[in-house]
């Protein structure tokens, strides 16, 4: 009898894009979790996860290979190496919280280069100036007709997290923005 083998394939496998001013690449597979918790649980969860959960708007924190993005009061997106079990790690805190694995729901597109800001702003109304959106800033916002989580990793690198079902649309919009950035 033959054996079935499950192979994980990126929703953007084979996609290529960018321009002379912008590089568009699919981020490596990652573990992700949506975390909700009351303020009194933040310290215990931070300790269990190995990263200090940010408590201010647009803030992020990185520790132990994990990045925590503040999405709203009492809500974070956790991103870490593939295989990280955020649900089990958070359970070790022994405090009231909700942690849901969303690793297969999202995909990330890395937008980098001198025209990265222009490419992202082509379909995102967020003010991406250094004063309003410095390195380390993150936000749940819109891009075209979809919701994304935007994270500024460095001066000219943005991580665009979107749902897999919107990956093709998101990548196409970023390709158009990258072309505009090269003009």
What are the residue ranges of the model-derived segments?
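Basic, glycine/lysine-rich polyanion-binding surfaces/domains
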Residues: 1-183
């Amino acid at each position: 009898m033959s054996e079935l083998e499950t192979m994980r394939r990126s929703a953007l496998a084979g996609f290529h894009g960018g321009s002379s001013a912008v590089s568009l690449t699919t981020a490596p597979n990652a573990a992700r979790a949506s975390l909700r918790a009351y303020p009194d649980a933040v310290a215990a969860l931070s300790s269990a996860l190995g990263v200090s959960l940010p408590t201010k708007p647009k803030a992020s924190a990185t520790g132990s290979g994990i990045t925590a993005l503040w999405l709203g009061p009492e809500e974070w997106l956790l991103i870490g190496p593939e295989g990280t079990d955020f649900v089990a790690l958070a359970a070790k805190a022994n405090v009231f919280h909700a942690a849901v694995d969303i690793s297969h729901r999202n995909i990330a597109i890395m937008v980098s280069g001198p025209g990265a800001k222009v490419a992202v702003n082509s379909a995102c109304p967020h003010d991406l100036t250094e004063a309003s959106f410095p390195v380390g800033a993150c936000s749940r916002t819109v891009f075209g007709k979809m919701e994304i989580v935007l994270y500024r990793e460095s001066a000219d690198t943005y991580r665009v997290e979107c749902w897999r079902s919107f990956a093709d649309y998101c990548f196409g919009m970023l390709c158009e923005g990258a072309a505009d950035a090269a003009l």
